[in-house]
Amino acid sequence: MHPPMSPKRGPHRLARWVLALLLALGTTWLAPAPAMAAMDVAKQVLIGADFHDQDLRGATFNLTNLRDATFAGSDLQGASLFGAKLQDADLSNTNLREATLDSAIFDGTNLTNAVLEDAFAFNTKFTNVVIEGADFTNVPLRGDALKTLCGVASGTNPVTGRDTRSSLGCS
């Protein structure tokens, strides 16, 4: 047999239990939502895909065929486009900061006003690209790619305020 509960002890125990429950529920409701996992569409054929104005930070497009794809206005910071085929793709007004672009093919690609600051693009192929207003600050490029880009570089990036030719180090 249990001793009878004191009238003073019972309500306090219940109040503490309710308070603990409310605190536990409150912290789960107030906790920040977990970040969405980055999109991974490596080795896909996404010809003509529409990704405009999307948050694609950290996404993986490695070895993906993105011919004629639209990324205009998207945030691709830290994304990996290693070996991606971006012929005639629209990457105008995109954030490509810290993106991996190594071995990607940019042929007829529109990079107008794109920010590529700190992107890795050493073995990237650039032909017939539009780079007016693009910012290539701290982007390692091979000599042949740099020569091609300096031949068409013009404008000032509206986000960073940097001149395209200066960001490439063109003479």
Pin down the residues of each PLM region.
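Tandem repeat scaffolds
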Residues: 2, 6-18, 25-171
